[in-house]
Amino acid sequence: TSNTRSNTFGWLGQFPHFREWIGTRVMQQMAAHGYSITNKTWEDTVAISRDDFDDDILGIYSPIFQEMGRAAGCFPDELVFQALANADKTACYDGQNFFDPEHPVYEKVDGTGKMVPVSNLFTLKVGAAGATTDYTGPGWYLMDCTRVIKPLIYQNRRNPELVMQADPKTGVTFTDNQIVFGASLRSNVGYGFWQMAQMMKAPLNSD
């Protein structure tokens, strides 16, 4: 849930892990990562002739409003899965693409020490023996969604709301004899821990 124009996820770095407590606690300074997700406003608008709306005895316009409600309910899923489809070419909190062969991982959680590149993107080499041609078919994903922090972040700022403009003295109802129904919401999607997701560019089979 979001309550501002944008949210910055400064904790999206490598979390410390537990160690045996021997002697004094070891204080670890977390690496800071300024990863912001800015909310966007989305809308869907339908204009209907006021005469047609007044004469709608059979309720032919009711399915339109039902569809607007269905679309609003499905929209978060559309955003999330579009982000997933683009995740191998969109940067996450460490500056690399979310699915990338070279995520920088450091020895210490403050971002110091030896850096080791870690991959969460596997691309199968295809062709004859020794070939270096990348697999170009559809990829598939393996994700751990059991944790509190998810691989993908859906940030909701304002739930969908339906507004009707039907005042005959103002707006398009006055100028064009139309009644306008508009649905809007504010939200956005971004990337969480790449460590919880793996993209496989390879056939999904028993091999």
Range-by-range predicted roles:
Residues 1-40:
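Assembly/oligomerization interface modules of large self-assembling protein complexes
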Residues 18-19, 54-56, 186:
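Short active-site-adjacent helix-start/loop capping segments
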Residues 43-45, 66-70:
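Contiguous, well-ordered alpha-helical segments that form the cores/surfaces of helical PPI scaffolds
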Residues 38-54:
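Glycine-rich, often proline-containing surface loops adjacent to acidic residues and nearby aromatics
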Residues 51, 56-59, 63, 70-134, ...:
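Alpha-helical scaffold segments that mediate packing/assembly in large oligomeric complexes
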Residues 102-207:
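Sequence/fold signature of self-assembling virion shell proteins
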